[in-house]
């Protein structure tokens, strides 16, 4: 969609394989759970504060441009790498059930002392700062 004024988009459970929100620069909430997405580009969605993209096939998620994100639910995907490095990360994160997740980019190792990541097995992780 080219609707730059779109603030909320709920397109979950539609069997979509592709979603382009690059022109929706004022998007604040995106719900695209229960689809068949393999990628999701939110680099232009700097106003995004809630992202729900669980139960897809997403392998990488880069949220480095999402400076106001408050809630991320990306559980049950095929995530290998998750980029949370944005200089001010303070969001609630649920990335459970991503068995191949071995790379999380963060600004500080202290981020992993918070509740959102207490359930992950860090033995297989590489931390990037």
Regions found by a protein language model. Give the residues of each.
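C-terminal helix/turn sub-motif of individual leucine-rich repeats
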Residues: 1, 22, 43, 64-67, ...
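Thr-biased low-complexity repeat/linker tracts and other Thr-enriched repetitive architectures
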Residues: 1-4, 15-18, 22-26, 36-39, ...
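Consensus "Asn ladder" position of solenoid repeat domains
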Residues: 14, 35, 56, 77, ...
